[in-house]
Every structure is written in C-alpha cells, then in structure tokens.
C-alpha cells in the first residue's frame, strides 16, 4: 500500500509541476536532444502534459498487473514502477528547466538515471517468483523453477554490472550514451537469455 501511495504522489507531483510552471514556459519546448542541445521543438500546449499523462498510464497499467500477482512480485512490480516514474519525472523536470533557460546536461541525467534504474531493478530481479510479468521470462525459465531462479540470478548480476558501466560512462561519453545504453542492455538480455538456456540444457539434458 505504501509503494502504491508513492506512485500516486509522483504522478500527482508531475501534473502539479506542469500546471504551476505552465505560465512561465515559452511557447515552444524541446522534446529531443542531440549533443546535449535541442533537436526537436514542439508547441507548449501539446508537450507539457505528455510525460505526466504517460506516467499516469504507466502507473495504471502496473496497478492492474499487480492485482493477481503474489505479494512478493507485487512489491517488485511497484518498486519497478516507482523507479520508472521517478526517472520520467526527472526527465520532465530537466525538459522544463531547459525550456526556462537553465543549463542542464540532459545526456548525463539520462545516463545516470538509466544506470541507477538498472542497478536497482537488476538487484531486485533475482527475488522475483516464477511469473509471466517480471524477470527473465523465456519458455525454459517458465517451464522449470530451478532454471528460473538460476537464470534470474545471473541476469540480475549482469544488469547491475550494466547499470554501473552506464552510470560511469555517462560522465564521459556525452551524446553517445544513448547508443551505449541500447547496445549494453541488448547485450545483457542476449547473454542472460543464452545463460538461462544453458542452465536448462544442463539440468534437463539427461531427461
């Protein structure tokens, strides 16, 4: 219940921030960056509530998913939801501050945010019970509970390492951090999937 309240507070804070700052913002707001500079600008009425609405939809979706989840998985889902909502809110604040004329290193913020998200999410991933919503979900991890535990424990470590690398590199790589994030996350998913399949074959090869 406490984690649910935190989610609601973050979403409400996002809407409240947009409402309070609306009159102070210019008529055009950046929504995309290249080299830490705005690359795409859209009119204020269209963009200022995009992130708050996305956050609301995201929260409602996760809330519906938790209804039939076990207590442990429900807690992990809300943890993931809260982390993502915080990341989106920080991105919203960064966008609004840039629009108000403040200098904000958006590439660094995104890199650090995603890195921390992966560290927290990866660390909690190993605690997930077998399910179809969170964790490393493949036909073989869902089929064998032991493979699920081994695969998610391995993926948890890989994602934490991936998060640390992204967080550190975000201080040095500038606009390339987005590409680096995509490559590292995809690599982590591929390695984790292959590792879980290896566990499955090792445990079930003689059956």
Curated annotation (Swiss-Prot):
GO terms for biological process: response to toxic substance. It is a multi-pass membrane protein. InterPro entries: DUF1648, SdpI, SdpI/YhfL. GO terms for cellular component: membrane. Changing residue 6 to T: Ability to bypass the requirement of SdpC binding for expression of the sdpRI genes. Keywords: Membrane, Transmembrane, Transmembrane helix. Pfam families: DUF1648 (PF07853), SdpI (PF13630). The chain crosses the membrane at residues 5-25, 47-67, 78-98, 100-120, 150-170, 171-191. The lineage of its organism: Bacteria, Bacillati, Bacillota, Bacilli, Bacillales. It comes from the Bacteria. Immunity protein that provides protection for the cell against the toxic effects of SDP, its own SdpC-derived killing factor, and that functions as a receptor/signal transduction protein as well. Once SDP accumulates in the extracellular milieu, SdpI binds to SDP, causing sequestration of SdpR at the bacterial membrane. Disruption phenotype: Results in increased SigW expression which is dependent on SdpC. Results in weaker growth (70% of wild-type cell density) on LB medium, with more pronounced effects on sporulation medium (15% of wild-type). Concomitant deletion of SigW results in greatly diminished growth (5% of wild-type on LB and 3% on sporulation medium). Over time, single SdpI mutant stops growing on sporulation medium, while the SdpI SigW double mutant eventually lyses. Deletion of RsiW restores growth of the SdpI single mutant to near wild-type levels. Induction: By Spo0A during nutrient starvation, through its direct negative control of AbrB, repressed by AbrB during regular growth when nutrients are plentiful, and also by SdpR. Induced by expression of SDP (active peptide of sdpC). This is Immunity protein SdpI. Its main location: membrane. It is found in: Membrane.
């Amino acid at each position: 219940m406490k984690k649910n309240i935190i989610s609601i507070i973050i979403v409400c804070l996002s809407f409240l921030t947009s409402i309070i700052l609306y009159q102070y913002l210019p008529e055009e707001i950046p929504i995309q960056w290249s080299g830490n500079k705005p690359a795409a600008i859209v009119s204020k009425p269209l963009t200022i509530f995009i992130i708050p609405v996305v956050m609301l939809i995201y929260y409602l979706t996760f809330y519906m998913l938790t209804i039939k989840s076990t207590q442990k998985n429900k807690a992990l889902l809300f943890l993931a939801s809260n982390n993502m909502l915080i990341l989106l809110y920080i991105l919203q604040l960064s966008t609004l501050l840039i629009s108000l004329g403040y200098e904000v290193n958006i590439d660094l913020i995104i890199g650090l945010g995603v890195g921390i998200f992966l560290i927290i999410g990866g660390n909690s991933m190993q605690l997930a019970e077998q399910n179809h919503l969170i964790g490393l979900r493949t036909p073989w991890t869902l089929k064998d509970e032991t493979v699920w535990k081994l695969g998610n424990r391995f993926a948890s470590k890989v994602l934490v390492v991936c998060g640390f690398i992204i967080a550190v590199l975000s201080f040095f790589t500038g606009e390339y951090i987005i590409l680096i994030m995509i490559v590292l996350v995809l690599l982590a998913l591929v390695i984790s999937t292959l590792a879980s399949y290896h566990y499955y074959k090792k445990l079930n090869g003689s059956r």
